[in-house]
Amino acid sequence: MQPTEISPGLVVNVATPDLKLSDFKLIAFDMDSTLINIECVDEIADAAGRKAEVAAITEAAMRGEISDYKESLRQRVALLKGVSVASMDEVYRTRLRLNPGAARLVQACKDAGLKVLLVSGGFTFFTDRIRDELGIDYTRSNVLETTDGLLTGRMVDQPWGDICDGEEKRKMLLETCGQLGISPRQAIAMGDGANDLPMMGEAGLSVAYHAKPRVREQAMVAINEGGLDRLLELVK
């Protein structure tokens, strides 16, 4: 079907006839610029006086112009060396906000019996706090290495691997579906960047939120204006 703007800023690329929220058992969110309003790595870089440099790499990665996401993240994290944990806490307290409709959508999903997964190419410093704030069931993201309260410019390997990139997001979605005993077609995946496309491609419903052009085009549904909870206009 041709993309159809069913109301201003809400576009359906693939027909989703009469879907109900209760048809699904899991919703997976990207964090940066999807569930929250910022790219955390860019804001941490601001404390090091390197925001422009880091943000340029982030933008290229999210547009899908960088083929090696892991290497791009390593480059950005290396530029954070010397930033204090206190500066990261300040980013969390003063700059990070949930995007409009985030809390309402998460609560509606929980009320309908869905489990909630947060998968991020960002960092546990932030995903753990968002998890606790919203009562999220599962998370996967990257650990920043610190020494004496300062970032070393490196990340810590975890039991599942080294970096949560697009492929790891896809694997985590599938793993979580396996744990729940459900099909990936019973999952919703929401994101904004190229590294969200692998998990969005596995889900029964893929939703782009204020996304890069390539992601808007490939998602089944695109929310281009308004809050995350606009999904509830389609999936009641």
UniProtKB/Swiss-Prot annotation:
Q: List the disulfide bonds.
A: none
Task: Name any cofactors this protein relies on.
Answer: Mg(2+)
Catalyses:
O-phospho-L-serine + H2O = L-serine + phosphate; O-phospho-D-serine + H2O = D-serine + phosphate
For this entry, list what GO says about its biological process: L-serine biosynthetic process
Annotated Gene Ontology cellular components are:
cytoplasm
Q: Pfam families, per this entry?
A: HAD
- State the UniProt keywords alphabetically: Amino-acid biosynthesis, Hydrolase, Magnesium, Metal-binding, Serine biosynthesis
Which protein family is named in the record? Belongs to the HAD-like hydrolase superfamily. SerB family.
Q: What is this protein called?
A: Phosphoserine phosphatase
- Species name for this entry? Polaromonas sp. (strain JS666 / ATCC BAA-500)
- The gene from which this protein is expressed is serB
